[in-house]
Regions:
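Hydrophobic beta-strand segment of the Class I
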Residues: 117-118
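Short catalytic micro-motifs in class I SAM-dependent methyltransferases
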Residues: 121-122
Length: 221
């Protein structure tokens, strides 16, 4: 693990314009992966309310609008530059998209209930307890029978343990709290993810895609 770590918002602000190209090169079967993110969403012309956490430049929105052309989507990200790229890409959908510049670790989920909440390649920078608390907030923000969808960087349990130990080493060396505030990878295994969802109270775990270290799964409230 690279001991040089960067503040999360600065990291993504600096890379906003090149982010899409980077993801296309680094996500296994990029097009298939992002198409699978929208797979659990039911096709409808009705208005559905969706919250996209750590939305970045909105790579997942294209396929979502194909299935739900009248969706209202709240797009939350701590990088203002990422959101600017998103708004330019989807300027013809500006009446359907609300951008929120904030960290999902500090965001209040109390204002609205959602039919779907999703996160894509965003939650692998936070630890078990922090992620559990975030899942609890997500659970509460969903409508009855609402669905949470996650497309994520996943690893086997051996690599999960190794990267966690490396994280602890960096934390000790830097003598700072870096959980969720700095760009450092702490990915989990699918087994750990299932345990977290069980602890939260989610049900009906479904694995929609798993290729190398990229996976898409969903759970129901």
């Amino acid at each position: 693990m690279n001991s040089k770590i960067e503040d999360m918002s600065n990291f993504f602000d600096l890379r906003a314009k090149s982010y899409d190209t980077h993801m296309k090169k680094n996500v296994d079967n990029f097009n298939v992966f992002y198409k699978r993110v929208s797979k659990p969403i039911i096709k409808t012309n009705k208005k559905v309310n969706i919250l996209d956490l750590g939305c970045g430049t909105g790579l997942e929105l294209k396929n979502i609008f194909k299935k739900c052309p009248n969706a209202q989507i709240d797009c939350l990200d701590l990088s203002k530059e990422m959101l600017e790229v998103l708004k330019e890409k989807y300027k013809d959908r500006q009446s359907q998209i609300k951008t929120i510049t904030a960290s999902y670790l500090d965001y209040s989920f109390k204002e609205q209930k959602y039919d779907y909440i999703l996160s894509v390649m965003s939650f692998h920078h936070i630890l078990h307890k922090t992620k559990l608390n975030l899942y609890i907030s997500i659970f509460k923000a969903l409508n009855p029978d609402g669905l949470y969808i996650e497309g994520e960087y996943v690893v086997n349990q051996t690599k999960e343990s190794r990267l966690y130990k490396e994280y602890l080493k960096v934390k000790e060396e830097k003598n700072i709290e870096i959980d969720g505030t700095f760009h450092i990878d702490i990915p989990f295994s699918i087994k750990t993810q299932k345990q977290l969802f069980d602890e939260t109270g989610f049900k009906t775990f479904q694995l929609h895609y798993h290729e190398n270290e990229a996976a898409v799964y969903s759970v129901k409230k």
